[in-house]
UniProtKB/Swiss-Prot annotation:
InterPro entries: AAA+_ATPase (IPR003593), ABC_transp_ATP-bind (IPR050319), ABC_transporter-like_ATP-bd (IPR003439), ABC_transporter-like_CS (IPR017871), Oligopep_ABC_C (IPR013563), P-loop_NTPase (IPR027417). Residues 7-252 form the ABC transporter domain. This is Putative oligopeptide transport ATP-binding protein YkfD. It comes from Bacillus subtilis (strain 168). One of its GO terms (biological process) is transmembrane transport. Its EC number is 7.4.2.-. SMART domains: AAA. ATP binds at G44, E45, S46, G47, C48, G49, K50, S51. It holds the Pfam family ABC_tran. Belongs to the ABC transporter superfamily. GO terms for molecular function: ATP binding; ATP hydrolysis activity. NCBIfam families: oligo_HPY (TIGR01727). Keywords: ATP-binding, Nucleotide-binding, Translocase, Transport.
Length: 329
């Protein structure tokens, strides 16, 4: 059974003034949906706009154009009072577990603060009990509540950040590269923790990352971003088994394979040049300057994200005949 959309993004743009009449097009016309109860993975190289997109969804930025609707409500057209109420439903886990926690507050105070701001639960004692429950839920002993952030490892700090995000009983969480600053062994622990919490609490996640090998294990569907544009969206298993967009293929070919023989035999797709500047993106398809399959028409018109089969979207002139699902070459 196909789940209903919880959050819908339509033609979203987030441009920044760079001075001297220049504009940084961090997000440039992105459209997608996140279904209730799923984890939507968002991947791409550093600088592609994925973290900016996550911050727009959290209303940390006011979009230049487009809309973000949550259960049919436009998040960027809310009054101040309505925004305050919505803050309980939408929370964020930040990338840097070292910078996102106040060093002057104890762990208990960090987790307690959102509940006090929103006046949750009847008494201070009841809130303290919830703090202990949250610490246990993320794998930390309640006694750790009296300690300060500098006393913990990176993985433990990220667990504290997760507990803080859960303190308001949210429905939707933006996890902005929550494992990128952690050791590989700790990354797996945090991913497994998020999967367990999602199952127990019915959470919906936007999981932002640049490491496709880890995104595979947590995401139901994945969107691939490049230079502010969505290149491909499909089910996680389908993306890894049969990627369509040349950029997706290149990203997947960079994931190392543990078997040395298979690693030596497989074809690697090396992208030409550097990521273009979002101040001056290429005309037509923004990926054409690095694409191994670029055609003349790629510089003439920008391919639109189109559904070439149920639940599968790609923005590439190679698949312009959506009705027959045929590749041009």
């Amino acid at each position: 059974m196909r789940r209903l959309p919880l959050l819908e993004v339509s033609q979203l743009k987030m441009h920044f003034d760079a001075g001297k009449k220049r504009t940084v097009k961090a997000v440039d016309g992105v459209t997608f949906q996140i279904r209730e109860g799923e984890t939507f993975g968002l991947v791409g190289e550093s600088g592609c706009g994925k973290s900016t997109l996550g911050r727009v969804l959290m209303r940390l930025y006011q979009p230049t154009e487009g809309s973000v609707t949550y259960r049919g409500t436009n998040l960027h057209a809310l009054s101040e009072k309505e925004q305050f109420a919505f803050n309980r439903k939408l929370q964020m886990i930040f990338q840097d577990p070292y910078a996102s926690l106040n060093p002057r507050m104890t762990v208990r105070e960090i987790i307690l603060e959102p509940m006090e701001i929103h006046n949750l639960y009847n008494t201070h004692k009841a809130r303290l009990l919830v703090v202990d429950e949250l610490l246990e839920a993320v794998g930390l002993h309640p006694d750790f509540g009296s300690r300060y952030p500098h006393e913990f490892s990176g993985g433990q700090r990220q667990r504290i950040g997760i507990a803080r995000a859960l303190s308001l009983n949210p429905e939707f969480i933006v996890a902005d590269e929550p494992i990128s600053a952690l050791d590989v062994s700790v990354q797996a622990q945090v991913v497994n923790l998020l999967k367990r919490l999602q199952k127990e609490k019915g959470l919906t996640f936007l999981f932002i990352a640049h490491d496709l090998s880890m995104v595979k294990h947590i995401s139901d569907r994945i969107g691939v971003m490049y230079l502010g544009h969505m290149m491909e969206i499909t089910e996680s298993g389908t993306l890894y088994r049969e990627p369509l967009h040349p950029y997706t293929k290149a990203l997947l070919s960079s994931i190392p394979i543990p078997d040395p023989e298979l690693e030596d035999k497989r074809e690697r797709i090396l992208l030409k040049g550097e990521l273009p500047s979002p101040v001056n993106p290429p005309s037509g398809c923004v990926f054409r300057t690095r694409c191994p399959e670029a055609m003349p028409e790629c510089g003439e018109s920008r391919p639109q994200l189109q559904e070439i089969e149920p639940g599968r979207f790609v923005a590439c002139h190679l698949y312009r005949n959506a009705e027959t699902k045929e590749k041009v070459r």
